[in-house]
């Protein structure tokens, strides 16, 4: 049954284990990256909304100032 020395089988098991850990770490890193991207996207959307509100209120103020010519 043993065609190779025991240490060869141990190396093969080590390679398989390393590949498994590599895939698991890559998936975990992808989750962390996705969470970071979503957080940064939410911050960006909040900034855009605040800027839109600021411009809208600024535009309304300018319209009100233009109408009250005395």
Swiss-Prot record:
GO terms for cellular component: plasma membrane. The keyword Transmembrane applies. InterPro entries: Spore_YhaL. It is a single-pass membrane protein. GO terms for biological process: sporulation resulting in formation of a cellular spore. It is found in: Cell membrane. Disulfide bonds: none annotated. Keywords: Cell membrane, Membrane, Sporulation, Transmembrane, Transmembrane helix. Pfam families: Spore_YhaL. The chain crosses the membrane at residues 3-23. Induction: Expression controlled by a sigma-E-regulated promoter which needs the sigma-E factor for the binding of the RNA polymerase and subsequent transcription. Residues 48-70 are annotated as: Disordered. Required for efficient sporulation. This is Sporulation protein YhaL. The gene is yhaL.
